[in-house]
């Protein structure tokens, strides 16, 4: 459930604020987030496991705005990061580094050093060379690095190939066949402390079976490691739980948690870590855009809008479908439109074959844009990145200013005469 709904006046509201008012105040394109929705989705995970020892580590990559991170930090959230930049964002937003897990296949020595100095919860290590590097950096600092190995369980997540991460052909993690051997190596290195086991098989999963298959494989590995004297303290099941974009029927966090807890009856000493990103942020945000022109040809009707693929790349990159609805629905006969932006690429579209009643100047909302929206945006075609607003009841906060054109080349210089 989210808090973007049509009210009695016929307008689309974010909590207690008409979205049209925000468009008029802050301009378009504009990302709008709902604090109540973010909190509701986070609590859905937190409450689903009851009093079982657990930590919710929000995946910063989904939406890294400081206002979003601070909202979750106030709830007690941990964070899943993949760069030192994301780590510094968490700190700037008031996050607790002791609740941070550091994922990613290419951690640099400088990133490792900074994370160790801040005493993060755990490094999710993805290769043997990374183990050796982390052991070296930790030794130079005179500390032990807490580590978990990201295991690739070779489970087909049955999602888009670009967001599938748990197959042996993917770059992520350590293959299941070699997992025990790499754990032995980690256990033998003097500056590492083996804490956990981790996996993340993909994103936007709409069935429980892949999660459960992966978990069963990890629990079997935990048992075999214990027999060798390697004791695993936490199970990090990653993220990936899907959301409703169109007509998907993803499991609820409560269903997911129940299935996991049923399997953890024999492992009550394991802390459970979740890394949800999309499931918390996606439906907590919309992208508001304006219709600039209606272009009719013999073969197609185009609604040319002021938002483009540089603002929201998911439709172009993943062929993703996101609902696009008017802020003020009109009466009349709908026509079928492709909704396209101003960028000079044929792939610059946010929706195709949408039945809408439109006029130039109308305002539209691209739903489910709170995750992998702004964080994947760019300045392609020298377009300033858009503003972001957080709605909290009847109050609104500009949590990111729209970029000024001059800022786009402020770090550049021309050659001397």
Curated annotation (Swiss-Prot):
Pyridoxal 5'-phosphate binds at residues 240, 275-278, 372. It holds the Pfam family Orn_DAP_Arg_deC. Specifically catalyzes the decarboxylation of meso-diaminopimelate (meso-DAP) to L-lysine. Keywords: Amino-acid biosynthesis, Decarboxylase, Lyase, Lysine biosynthesis, Pyridoxal phosphate. Homodimer. Substrate binds at residues 278, 314, 318, 345, 372. InterPro entries: Ala_racemase/Decarboxylase_C (IPR009006), DAP_deCOOHase_LysA (IPR002986), De-COase2_C (IPR022643), De-COase2_CS (IPR022657), De-COase2_N (IPR022644), De-COase2_pyr-phos_BS (IPR022653), Orn/DAP/Arg_de-COase (IPR000183), PLP-binding_barrel (IPR029066). This is Diaminopimelate decarboxylase. The modification N6-(pyridoxal phosphate)lysine is found at residue 61. It comes from Vibrio cholerae serotype O1 (strain ATCC 39315 / El Tor Inaba N16961).
């Amino acid at each position: 459930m989210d808090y973007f709904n049509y009210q009695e006046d016929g307008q689309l509201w974010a909590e207690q604020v008409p979205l049209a008012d925000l468009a008029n105040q802050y301009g378009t394109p504009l990302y709008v987030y709902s604090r109540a929705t973010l909190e509701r989705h986070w609590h859905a995970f937190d409450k689903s496991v009851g009093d079982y020892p657990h930590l919710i580590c929000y995946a910063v990559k989904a939406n890294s705005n400081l206002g979003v991170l601070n909202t979750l930090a106030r709830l007690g959230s941990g964070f899943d990061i993949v760069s030192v930049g994301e780590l510094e964002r968490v700190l700037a937003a008031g996050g607790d580094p002791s609740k941070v897990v550091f994922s990613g296949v290419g951690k640099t020595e400088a990133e490792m050093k900074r994370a160790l100095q801040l005493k993060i919860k755990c490094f999710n290590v993805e290769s043997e060379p990374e183990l050796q590097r982390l052991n070296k950096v930790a030794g130079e600092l005179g500390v032990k690095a807490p580590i978990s190995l990201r295991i690739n369980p070779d489970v087909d997540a049955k999602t888009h190939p670009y967001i599938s991460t748990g197959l042996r052909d993917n770059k992520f993690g350590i293959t299941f066949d070699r997992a025990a051997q790499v754990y032995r190596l980690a256990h033998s290195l003097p500056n590492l402390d083996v804490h956990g086991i981790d996996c993340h098989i993909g994103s936007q999963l709409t069935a429980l079976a892949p999660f459960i298959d992966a978990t069963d494989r990890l629990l079997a590995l935990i048992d075999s490691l214990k027999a060798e004297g390697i004791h695993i303290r936490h199970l990090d099941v990653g993220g990936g739980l899907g959301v409703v974009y169109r007509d998907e029927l993803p499991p609820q966090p409560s269903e997911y948690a129940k299935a996991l807890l049923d399997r953890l009856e024999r492992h009550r000493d394991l802390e459970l870590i979740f890394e949800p990103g999309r499931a918390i942020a996606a439906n907590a945000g919309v992208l508001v855009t304006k219709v600039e022109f209606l272009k009719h040809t013999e073969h197609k009707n185009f609604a040319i809008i002021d938002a483009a693929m540089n603002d929201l790349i998911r439709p172009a990159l993943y062929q993703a479908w996101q609902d696009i609805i008017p802020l003020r629905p009109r009466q009349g006969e709908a026509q079928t439109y492709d909704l396209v932006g101003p960028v000079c690429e044929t792939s610059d579209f946010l929706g195709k074959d949408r039945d809408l009643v439109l006029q130039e100047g109308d305002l539209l909302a691209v739903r489910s844009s709170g995750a992998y929206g702004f964080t994947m945006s760019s300045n392609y075609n020298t377009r300033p990145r858009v503003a972001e607003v957080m709605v909290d009841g009847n109050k609104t906060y500009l949590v990111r200013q729209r970029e000024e054109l001059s800022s786009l080349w402020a770090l550049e210089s021309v050659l001397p005469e």
